[in-house]
Design a protein with these regions (language model features):
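Nucleotide/pyrophosphate-binding catalytic subdomain
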Residues: 20, 27-251, 430-431, 446, ...
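A conserved regulatory-domain signal marking ACT and ACT-like small-molecule sensing domains
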Residues: 273-455
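Acidic-aromatic/histidine active-site loop/patch
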Residues: 254
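Glycine-rich beta-alpha junction loops
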Residues: 74, 210-212, 257-261, 265-270, ...
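Short hydrophobic alpha-helical runs that function as membrane-insertion/retention elements
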Residues: 203-207, 261-263, 336, 418
Length: 455
């Protein structure tokens, strides 16, 4: 049995990952290696695309590599399945309903692995598919947001030794009671990295509909450029701040177990040379690279799926933050930015942001439970905000970065509602209507449209 955790609160066991090494290790593709491929929903979006994925995987297997593949559900399938669930039970799901939602949502990936295994067999490649519970991938019981506790890789290793490609469902696992669980949106990324960690894979390649990690979303800033490398710290911040390329927990896994990650496109020709393919996209690196330190800001992340609440006129007494946020945490709702104003006349205002999908639940909690309990005067709610962040490992050693950000936004007439900082990022909360203007202005201000330095 080999096990791992998605974060500090899950630390129970440690994956064996001796094969992972460091970024300066020899190229793992020069000799036979165990490689994990992950394909997103768009890459699996049609029979033709699935056949192309199979051809790409078969190419790697024929080159002598042991291959484990983790596909997502076909694009749109998870939404379709959850839409069916909503149609038969439109109410707010309780614990029992969340269990059934996981049972339903997990079927999307089950279809994908079966189709991909069939496509590989059609290519003359021995292949077998497994669901998360068949492996098994063991999780806790937090339905729709489960965390991986351990992976038993014995069955998978036996199939690899027999020359088979193993296709495993992403996004899902099984809890201690035998119930199917899902890891939350983007959970297939986490599944792939966890499998790579458990099996000591040489590298985990994440195939998406983009060809790497960009300085920001090219749909917002056409001049955004692809980065050849990005540090683990920067990628973790970018993912947690709204970048859709990788799911946050997958980056946490990669950092904890030193899994080499590369993000690349599944829409390049499947028959591209393996050595060329293995060097494409963006490598998430663990080296403290001097070249990286020269870039003060590496990227701009943004998230429009946020909502802000302000509890007005709260008694300024010890423990007030816990009284407000404790009830929110008990409802399994994650809080992002938190700001408490300076006290006036013994009262203060307390603001925080949550994911927009939790807006109604938090609104009801504040109205019916929190505000009456803590003695606040009232609360306000704003579901139309966004968060824009600058990220860069060079911010550790450069002064004046935040002031440049604030000046740039002021010159565009954009008001800042909230600010939060860490060693390598500064985030601001803005009115949603200013998001794209802010991202474009900051991208220019920090010179991110300039060519990436080489050497």
């Amino acid at each position: 049995m080999r096990g791992c955790a998605a974060g500090p609160r899950d630390a129970r066991r440690v994956f064996h990952s001796a094969a992972n090494g460091t970024d300066s290790a020899p190229n793992p593709f020069l000799t036979m290696a165990l490689i994990v491929h992950k394909y997103g929903g768009t890459s699996m979006g049609s029979p033709e695309r699935i056949r192309n994925v199979a051809k790409r995987v078969a190419k790697w297997a024929r080159a002598g590599h042991q291959m484990v593949v983790v596909p997502s559900a076909m694009s749109g399938e998870t939404n379709r399945l959850l839409g069916l669930a909503k149609a038969v039970n439109p109410g707010q799901p309780d614990a029992a309903a969340l269990r059934e939602l996981d049972m339903i949502a997990a079927t999307g990936e089950q279809v994908s692995v079966g189709l991909l295994a069939l496509a590989l067999q059609a290519e003359g490649m021995p292949a077998v598919s497994y669901t998360g519970w068949q492996v098994p991938v063991k999780t806790d019981s937090a339905f729709t947001k489960a965390r991986i506790e351990s992976i038993d890789d014995g069955r998978v290793r036996a199939d690899l030794a027999a020359g088979k490609v193993v296709v495993i469902t992403g996004f899902q696992g099984i809890d201690g009671d035998g119930s199917v669980t899902t890891l939350g949106r983007g959970g297939s990324d986490t599944s792939a990295v966890a499998v790579a960690a458990a099996m000591g894979a040489a590298e985990c390649l994440i195939y998406t509909d983009v060809d790497g990690v960009y300085t920001t979303d090219p749909r917002v800033v056409p001049e955004a450029r692809r980065m050849h490398t990005i540090s683990f710290e920067e990628m973790l911040e970018m993912a947690s701040l709204g970048s859709k390329v990788l799911q946050t927990r997958s980056v946490e896994f990669a950092g904890k177990y030193r899994v080499k990650l590369r993000v690349l496109s599944s829409f390049t020709p499947w028959d591209i040379n393996i050595d060329e393919e293995a060097q494409s996209g963006t490598l998430i690196t663990f080296e403290d690279d001097e070249k990286m330190e020269q870039a003060v800001v590496s990227g701009i992340a943004f998230n429009r799926d946020e909502a802000k609440f302000t509890v007005v006129g709260v008694p300024d007494t010890p423990g007030i933050a816990y009284k407000i946020l404790g009830a929110v945490a008990d409802a399994n709702i994650e809080v992002d930015v938190i700001v408490q104003n300076v006290s006036h006349d013994g009262r203060t205002d307390f603001s925080f942001t949550v994911h927009r999908q939790d807006f109604q639940r938090v609104n009801d909690l504040l109205k019916n439970r929190i505000v009456p309990t803590v003695g606040a005067l009232q609360f306000t709610a704003d579901p139309r905000i966004c968060k824009v962040s600058i990220v860069g490992i060079g911010m550790k050693s450069h002064a004046g970065v935040a002031s440049t950000m604030f000046r740039t936004l002021a010159e565009e007439g954009i008001n800042i509602q909230m600010i939060t900082t860490s060693e390598i990022k500064t985030s601001v909360v803005l009115d949603e209507k200013y998001m794209e203007l802010a991202v474009r202005a900051l991208h220019r201000a920090f010179g991110l449209d300039a060519p990436e330095a080489v050497g």
